Amino acid sequence: MADVALITVHGMGETPPTYADGLMDRLRGQLGSLAGQVVMRSVYYQKILQDNQNYVWERTREHSAVRYPDLRKFVLFGFGDAAGLENRKEIPGSVYELAQGEIARTLLSAHALRPGMPVVFVAQSLGCQVLSSYIYDAQKAARGQPVGAGIWRNIDAWALAAIGRALTASEKTFLGAGTCAALVTTGCNIPVFIAAHKIMHIIPIERPTSLFKWINFYDPDDVLGWPLQPLPGGYNELVEDRIVNASGGVASLLLRSWNPFSHNSYWDDATVVAAIAAMLRRLAA
């Protein structure tokens, strides 16, 4: 029987639905006999954006001469993701709302196995902002405050449209991260989204549970991966920043400079995997 849920959220750029398979395999290897007590699910929202991005990329390749195709494609998909998620997010059916719907559906599938079990979220890159906004909106709705965008503006209406029925109280709590025991962020770029805000408007999520622990892994050479403790508003008390060498310590000066590989390699890092496994082991034991 499942004792704890692992929910992953992918980052920016072209992403296959199998993006978390490698991480999950490594975690199962470290968990050993406890692996059967962990239900593992991955949120996949890239399909909302990818067809349009592919269309623009192919048009560019066919009708223009551009250099650095791999880096250029990463920028197009990555920053296209960020722009798409934030643009007109208050509109019903926005990318922001659809992405939140994917998180909710993934959580519902875990809840069906064991209501109320603790959840460990692992989010990469842009997924950190997507998940943070989702939890922030859910907590705001739970306090009875108005939410301006996304499914938590009216979670009951979303449920009726998406799954054809009302949510139970247990499901609503679970979908709102009410049993979240841990959050691991890697290559997090939340600071990019909030840096232009006035200091008094920079407000992190609240601790969902008394067990809650947030570890943020970043590589100092990764310009898209940021520390969170320097942020105002309570991040210093909420988050533990940890430095890793996600790029693998390659010797070449060129390769040590930033590249998409270094940004997308956190889940291959032994230190990151060991930390996630330790969290799951503690909750499943």
Where are these regions (language model features)?
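Lipid deacylating catalytic domains
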Residues: 1-62, 82-122, 126-285
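Short, structured active-site "lid" loops
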Residues: 60-70
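A hydrophobic C-terminal alpha-helical subdomain
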Residues: 70-84
